[in-house]
Regions:
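HAMP signal relay modules and closely related sensory coiled-coil linkers
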Residues: 4-27
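Detector for a conserved hydrophobic position within an alpha-helical segment of the HATPase_c
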Residues: 232-233
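Membrane-proximal coiled-coil signaling linkers
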Residues: 15, 32-70, 76-77
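Conserved catalytic submotifs in the C-terminal HATPase_c
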Residues: 9, 109-114, 131, 136-146
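Short conserved segment of the HATPase_c
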Residues: 197-209, 229
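Short alpha-helical segment of the dimerization/phosphotransfer core of two-component systems
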Residues: 83-88
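Short helix-loop "hinge" at the ATP-lid/N-box region of the Bergerat-fold HATPase_c
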Residues: 165-166
Length: 265
């Protein structure tokens, strides 16, 4: 029971060594209670996130067993099952990745590389997605900018930011990717003209499983931005978000220049 509280024997002015030990004990119990609450919330969130796609798969599987279904219906139900199974697989994969990141089981393998080239490669991966929504993709960056980071982990960052931008930008909108360098480091921003975020959503956007309002809950599991935050912490980088409801969002990433090695875990 983490609600146990042991009172001290003396007032603040007359506290002795035993009182200090009691205060330390109470603080430890409070911290353990917080950890237990986080664990409980995590299990609850995972259960909820897995239950929803499993229910969808079950419902469509039952529909497929009906007689006299047209070929179009069978194809539609099959695609729905496949898409939902992919979401479930992504959820499990993200949970495992985030767990490894938070428990330091993934050690960054940093090297000096051209982040501009990496950004261009990541952007091109979403070409069919933005063209399908008739989104205008604007890119402003230098010919080359070197950073010292783990390429694979940084690719995870860019893919999350770009996929979110495409996902939340409406038909005919605009996505802008900017990069610039100065003496402090490299700054990359990803802006969109999508639905934007409320102040409360902005406050919690990097929390695990947080999806904000209904406009930010579609096709997601609330883990991507938590991973982005953790990866950038490992790289001694930072991320901030600027957004207004119905006015779009901008995510700004800052990274140290090549030659400035990040701190060891």
């Amino acid at each position: 029971d983490f609600s146990v509280y042991v009172p001290t024997f003396h007032t603040m002015e007359k506290r002795d060594y035993l009182d200090v030990m009691i205060l330390d004990f109470n603080k430890m119990v409070e911290e353990l209670g917080s950890i237990e609450t986080l664990k409980t919330d995590f299990v609850s969130n995972v259960s909820h996130e897995m239950k929803t796609p499993l229910s969808i798969i079950k419902n469509y599987a039952e529909l497929l067993q009906r007689d006299a279904l047209s070929e179009e219906q069978r194809r539609e139900y099959g695609e729905a099952i496949e898409n939902t199974a992919t979401r479930l697989s992504d959820l499990i994969s993200n949970i495992l990745k985030l767990n490894k990141l938070e428990n330091q089981k993934i050690q960054p393998e940093a090297e000096v590389y051209d982040v501009c080239r990496q950004l261009c490669d990541c952007i091109l991966q979403y070409e069919s997605a933005w063209e399908k929504k008739e989104i205008e993709m604007e890119v402003e960056m230098e010919d080359r900018a070197e950073i010292y980071a783990d390429q694979d982990l940084m690719e995870l960052v860019w893919n999350n930011l770009l996929s979110n931008a495409v996902k939340f930008t409406e038909l005919g909108g605009v996505i802008t990717v900017r990069q610039l360098s100065d003496e402090q480091g490299v700054t990359i921003s990803v802006s969109d003209t999508g639905c934007g975020m409320s102040k409360n959503t902005m406050k919690h956007i990097f929390d695990k499983f947080y999806q904000g309002d209904t406009s930010h809950s579609k096709e997601g599991n609330g883990l991507g931005m938590a991973m982005v935050k953790r990866v950038l912490e490992l790289m001694d980088g930072e991320i901030q978000v600027l957004s207004e409801e119905k006015q779009g969002s901008t995510f700004i990433v800052t990274l140290p220049m090549a030659g400035k090695e990040f701190g060891q875990l």
